[in-house]
Regions:
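Structured soluble/peripheral alpha/beta segments that form catalytic or ligand/cofactor-binding pockets
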Residues: 1-330
C-alpha cells in the first residue's frame, strides 16, 4: 500500500462533512472456531460520524451536528458485534465517542479502541479483550491490493478506500487464533439506500464480493467480482433471491458475455444495526442494516468460451459476511 493511500485512510484534517454526510471506518475479522470449524468466529467494528444530530442506532443517540472539531477530532459513534462461535453479541460496543487522530491511526479513549498502521500491517485493539494484526498480502492483483473508488454526481456520491483480504492474527481474551480480514473506509454524501452486499474468502486462496444497491425496485449497481487465485472475473449483472426469515439463504446468479456464476450464501448467525431519525423533526425514516456471518456453498463458475469450470471442490467453502439492508436514511 502506498503512502498516499495510507494517508487517505486516516486523514481528518482535510475532511469535509456536508449536511447529512457520513464517514465510517469498518473492519470485519473472520477467525477459527475451535468448537465448530464450519462456523468461524467473526467480529465487526465500525467507527463513524454523521453530520446529523438526530440519528439513533439501536436506540442510542450517535449523531452529532458538525462532528469535525477544531482540535482535529471527530465526534461520532462506535459500534461492534461479536459472534463467539455459538452466540451473537449484538451490541458488543455501542456508544457515542470522540475519535482522535494519532500518527497513521485513530483511537477512542472511552471505550478504549485503537486502529493504526505499522509498516505492512494494521493493529486493531478493542479494550483489553481483543487484539488483531491484519497484514497486507503481497499480490499484484487489483482485487487483493488496496483500492480506491469514487463516484459523484451533482455533488452527491461516495469516496471509498478498501482492502478485500488481509491475513489475520487474533488474540481473544488471551487466546490466539488466525484467519482473514476485510477493511473499508467510506465517505457517503448521499442517502443510504437498500443493498445486498457480501465479501467471502475461500480456503484455497479465492475471494469473492458482490454488491447490489437498489431503490424502488431498480438496481443502482450490479457487481460480482470473483478472483479464482490467478484471474479476476468481473460481472456487471446480478440477480439476488433471498429465502427464509431469521437466517436466510441468498441465491445469487450473475453473467457476462463469456461466463456465468451461481452460488448460495447460507447465513449461520445474524445481527442488525437499526438506524432511526426524524426528517425535518417529524417525518420518521428507518434504515435496518442486517449483517449475517455466512458461508458460500453450491458454487459453480462456467467459462462458456473455453469450457472451463470451477466448483466448490476446487476452491473450498467460502467464509465471510453477507448484508441485506432495507429502508432509506436521508
Amino acid at each position: 500500500m502506498n503512502n498516499k493511500t495510507i494517508r487517505k485512510i486516516f486523514d481528518l484534517k482535510n475532511l469535509s462533512l456536508g449536511r447529512n454526510a457520513w464517514i465510517w471506518w469498518f473492519w470485519l475479522f473472520f477467525f477459527k472456531n475451535p468448537s465448530n470449524s464450519q462456523k468461524p468466529r467473526q467480529v465487526a467494528i465500525l467507527w463513524s460520524a454523521k453530520n446529523d444530530a438526530n440519528i439513533k442506532c439501536n436506540g442510542i443517540e450517535l449523531g452529532t451536528k458538525n462532528p469535525l472539531k477544531e482540535d482535529g477530532s471527530v465526534h461520532g459513534g462506535i459500534a461492534a458485534w461479536y459472534f463467539d462461535g455459538k452466540k451473537m453479541h449484538d451490541n458488543f460496543l455501542l456508544s457515542r465517542v470522540k475519535i482522535n487522530q494519532i500518527p497513521l491511526g485513530l483511537y477512542t479513549p472511552y471505550p478504549d479502541t485503537k486502529f493504526q498502521f505499522k509498516e505492512d500491517f494494521f493493529k486493531i485493539t478493542i479494550k483489553d479483550k481483543m487484539k488483531f494484526k491484519a497484514t497486507l498480502i503481497k499480490d499484484k492483483n487489483k482485487f487483493i491490493t488496496p483500492w480506491v473508488k469514487e463516484h459523484k454526481y451533482f455533488g452527491l456520491g461516495y469516496d471509498m478506500t478498501g482492502i478485500n483480504k488481509l491475513n489475520l492474527k487474533a488474540t481473544i481474551n488471551g487466546k490466539k487464533s488466525n484467519g482473514t480480514a476485510y477493511f473499508q473506509k467510506v465517505l457517503l454524501n448521499a442517502p443510504a439506500v437498500p443493498w445486498y452486499w457480501g465479501i467471502f474468502h475461500f480456503k484455497h486462496g479465492a475471494f469473492l464480493s458482490y454488491f447490489n444497491p437498489h431503490f424502488l425496485g431498480k438496481s443502482l449497481k450490479k457487481d460480482v467480482s470473483f478472483y479464482d487465485g490467478k484471474i479476476l472475473h468481473k460481472f456487471d449483472n446480478i440477480k439476488v433471491k433471498g429465502t427464509g426469515n431469521s437466517l436466510p439463504t441468498f441465491h445469487i446468479k450473475a453473467c457476462n458475455n463469456e461466463k456465468t456464476i451461481d452460488f448460495l450464501v447460507k447465513s449461520y448467525s445474524k445481527t442488525t444495526w437499526n438506524f432511526r431519525k426524524k426528517k425535518f423533526g417529524f417525518i420518521p425514516t428507518t434504515f435496518d442494516y442486517r449483517q449475517y456471518p455466512a458461508k458460500i456453498t453450491n458454487f459453480k463458475f462456467n467459462n462458456m468460451k473455453n469450457g472451463s469450470t470451477i466448483s466448490e471442490k476446487d476452491i473450498g467453502i467460502g467464509i465471510g459476511n453477507a448484508e441485506h439492508s432495507t429502508g432509506i436514511l436521508i
